[in-house]
Amino acid sequence: MVNHKLWGGRFEASLEDWVEEFGASIGFDYRLAPYDLQGSLAHVKMLGQTGIIAPEEAAAIQAGLEKLLVRYQAGELEFDVRNEDIHMNMEALLTEEIGPVAGKLHTARSRNDQVATDMHLYLKDQIGQIADKLLNLRQVLLNLAEEHVETIMPGYTHLQHAQPISFAHHLLAYYQMFSRDSQRFAFNLEHTNLSPLGAAALAGTTFSIDRELTADLLGFKGIYHNSLDAVSDRDFILEFLSNSSILIMHLSRLCEELINWCSYEYGFVSLSDTFSTGSSIMPQKKNPDMAELIRGKSGRVYGHLFSLLTVMKSLPLAYNKDLQEDKEGMFDTVDTIQKSLDIMAGMLSSMTVNKEKMLVSTQQDFSNATELADYLAKKGLPFREAHEIVGKLVLECSKAGYYLQDIPLSRYQEVSSLIEEDIYQALESQTAVQKRNSLGGTGFAQIRQELERAKRQLEK
């Protein structure tokens, strides 16, 4: 049987259909089509300008590629599994378009540097889009924080009431996390913004190519300086998957809190109907499904990271077919992260905050216990002694069914003569929050300073 593959000259028989289907990647790498065409356009321009192929040949190939790009944008291109991948499909389509001269496009190029170039272009584009969506989410958080500087809520440790804080302070904690996520993707973009084109299969080429020219045409800031490295590593994808895993972990934590806060037991927020669903049997239900889905999708992103790490861990240099497994997880992670960022921004910007429920929650607990201990410490009592006294008072209140602010002054003064009538103001949630004006604290003045700093950061 004659083998019509572009690499078929060395073979006497063709792959069986089921084997061919197993080895094909066109079912998912079709997403690289516009980037493959971009890479080919840059490559053929370089071939023409350096005289490696004749000017009229370069012009014919360029015209054919531009027609394919128009057809792709119109949704008119059809791919064939028998052509394995996006690169061979494009070459087959180009041959149909312009004839045998299409075969000169692959001069001084391998599919190894071709696919690496495609993925660098694709990921560079997608990281830019993720950066924009992250910027939008951070702006949403800032807007919400500005509205709630003086909204008081319980702060938690171990999911137990710890100290009262400003809701804005809580939101700005996530703003900081997402800011670091933005920085990580910016570093990732730097590492992705290099051109592998011209590395060929693994050792470079005997043709006098101009790698700087193709890098410039494709908008890369530089080139890979080792041809083996250029075609054999996927650390730029691993870095993307790692950054995405950290980002979706942050999103998942925020989703967990939103899920808790909109429950009947908390009642701190209400999510918009547009981000909630109902039950097929319980008419009253309003479920935070979108938040739950983001939380759940963290697992698939983590899985893609560990999958590619496992693929890469034992690969000798240079290219191996195992690297075909680098794409599906990358594509799925891009989709998951972009949609999750959009959903999160939408949920936050449209939710309703129950300020009263948040405040009341801080008045029906012992989260002001630290205020009492600090009060005594500021009057000269060693903090450890103050801690012991307050702990016993909390135990006393717990048994009697009331709170620290309900203790009569006479009882306080039995415990310590240092306690005066001003203790009741010190125990108020708003006072407790306002006084925490240490740098980075939850005091209103500190929060307003942080908001101004964050605004300047976003404007850069």
Curated annotation (Swiss-Prot):
PROSITE patterns linked to this entry: FUMARATE_LYASES
Keyword ATP-binding part of the UniProt annotation: no
Highest taxon, organism lineage: Bacteria
Keyword entries, A-Z: Amino-acid biosynthesis, Arginine biosynthesis, Cytoplasm, Lyase
Signal peptide, first to last residue: none
Compartments (UniProt record): Cytoplasm
GO-annotated cellular components: cytosol
Gene Ontology molecular-function annotations: argininosuccinate lyase activity
HAMAP family, A to Z: Arg_succ_lyase
Record protein name field: Argininosuccinate lyase
Organism of this sequence: Streptococcus sanguinis (strain SK36)
Lineage summary: Bacteria, Bacillati, Bacillota, Bacilli, Lactobacillales
Gene name tied to this protein: argH
